[in-house]
Amino acid sequence: MSNTLIVQLDMERFCEEANIPATYVIEIVEHGIIEPQGHAPDAWRFEDYELLTAKRAAKLHKDLELEWEGVALALDLIEEVQQLRAENQRLKQRLGRFVGTANG
């Protein structure tokens, strides 16, 4: 049995916690950056981990004056870079073990 706690936030609470206006959240959802449960803004339920993504999206939009399409692309590229870095680290560790056993 898992002890994972899942916290869901309604639109009002999500906006408060992320410190972004509802109009931003609607744009973020419309561009597929986050995907809440529910079919309309008043019924949307967000997972708490989506707060970080929404905050990043709003910051990119505001600070770099990116359109929402550009924000979505930038976040996808950031995620891909993070995945590649993690894979690179795993491969370095495997190589280190291989080289270590070959020299021993």
Residue ranges with predicted function:
Residues 2-12, 16, 26, 30-31, ...:
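Arg/Lys-rich, alpha-helical DNA-contact motif
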